[in-house]
Amino acid sequence: MLSCLLRNDKRLEVFFSALDMKKSYLLALSGGSDSLFLLYLLKSRGVSFTAVHVDYGWRESSYREAEELKLRCQEEGVPLIVDHVPSKYTTSKDPENTARRYRYALFCKICREDNLAGIFLAHHANDQAETVLKRVLEGASLGNLKGMTSGASYNRIPLLRPLLHIPKQVLMQTLDAENIAYVHDVTNTDERYLRARMRNKIFPWLEEIFAKNITQPLLTLAQDSEELSCYMKQQAQPFLENIRQEHTTWSIEIPKPLIEQVFLAKWVCKEFFYKVGIVVSRHFLQMVYDHLSRNLPAEMRLRDKRVIVKAGVVMIE
């Protein structure tokens, strides 16, 4: 059933047809349903990979689970690296982000040492929906609601996520049908962590209120955001080609026809600041646009920089 289901998935076909099968990769293997599904998927596709399991020691059963993974990978002929995380990384005030930084640094280190071409991650449709909703509630811009992508990078190493369109329930049902055992990580339901609170409380509550599954609408929003971002980059590029640098001064022309297109004008200004190495707030961007649209000269401080707005020009010194 596993192979049959996966062979009928058009998006997986597209993903793997573009993958360089001559290279070897790294699989982040937790032992949960998601990463085990991905392990068998990669095997069924003939992908060469090394699995890496990070044991944080957060659960009493974690050492035993790591040993069971060793046996499973040995049976499947999959090379496995097990890393036991030092306690100083597991007792921080922000364990979620500390753990994420640790394992990504480890994955990158192994990729470079073993000449592995990318990192396979088992994020699925529910993870994607959580990411999008989190960004909506945090006030992300329309172009930044796209969530995770199937091919991103971290420290110049590709992050490969082929399961983003597949719901977790499908992964679990497929493994259950094949009698493939997997770890039920209790930290996934530990409400000390934001993701667990979203999973246990916010999503069920919203689905009860709306009487519908909200995952697919959020995935659609992510797709729309990605398409909008690509479109805006194309529209902004001709204006960004007018960026000039003289010594330590950067400048860009913002002509009147552009100023009349509010969304595009602010996008161009934001990208201009970003290319100079500055991330600006919505409030600051709005101030810059307001002075441009009213043709009012202004000087503003932005950390150690001076931003000058003149008629149709923004300068950074």
From Swiss-Prot:
InterPro entries: Rossmann-like_a/b/a_fold, TilS/TtcA_N, tRNA_Ile_lys_synt, tRNA_Ile_lys_synt_N. It catalyses: cytidine(34) in tRNA(Ile2) + L-lysine + ATP = lysidine(34) in tRNA(Ile2) + AMP + diphosphate + H(+). ATP binds at residues 30-35. GO terms for molecular function: ATP binding; tRNA(Ile)-lysidine synthase activity. Keywords: ATP-binding, Cytoplasm, Ligase, Nucleotide-binding, tRNA processing. Its EC number is 6.3.4.19. Gene3D superfamilies: HUPs. Pfam families: ATP_bind_3 (PF01171). Transmembrane segments: none annotated. GO terms for biological process: tRNA modification. The keyword Transmembrane does not apply. One of its GO terms (cellular component) is cytoplasm. It is found in: Cytoplasm. The keyword Nucleotide-binding applies. Ligates lysine onto the cytidine present at position 34 of the AUA codon-specific tRNA(Ile) that contains the anticodon CAU, in an ATP-dependent manner. Cytidine is converted to lysidine, thus changing the amino acid specificity of the tRNA from methionine to isoleucine. This is tRNA(Ile)-lysidine synthase. It comes from Chlamydia abortus (strain DSM 27085 / S26/3) (Chlamydophila abortus). The lineage of its organism: Bacteria, Pseudomonadati, Chlamydiota, Chlamydiia, Chlamydiales. The gene is tilS.
